[in-house]
Amino acid sequence: MGNMPITVLIDSEILAEIYQEARNSFPNECCGWLCGEKSGNKVTVVRKCINAQDSGTHPTVSERTAETAYVFSGEDVLDLNKSFDSDMPAMIIYHSHPNGKAYLSETDRQVATSPWGDGPAYPVQQLVIGIDNHQIVSSAQFAWSEDENEFVEINQYSGAAI
């Protein structure tokens, strides 16, 4: 095993903002991305997205709803791509799991990985927030590992009573 991926830092204020968004979206999944200075390794801005899973405008499996999946709108995907050429690029894509579990599901892994299997679909890490009826249970951060050729968990965060 060689190099571990570098952890992009998320401070407590950013986590609190995302956790509140997860609560406001519950029982649906929330989604968006976190931006930071191109030269740094810390996110400072939350860019919330509308979960377009139920919009009927995306070619995903129809039995999935916004309670079990998320998808960015076309406009959000364009904005995400534009961010990579800016001074404040997206560094982490986040979404919530209303089942209370903070893990990168098989579907999450497929969506986050390049369709050619040669790395991540976007040059970002992933953050998954586990939320249930009563609280934010926890969240977990994942990064692409060149050594393992897949996303690996690199950090866990405590939940919150919201």
Where do the language-model regions lie?
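Single, functionally critical "micro-switch" positions that shape active/binding sites
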Residues: 96
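Conserved beta-strand-loop surface patch within small alpha/beta domains used
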Residues: 1-90, 99-162
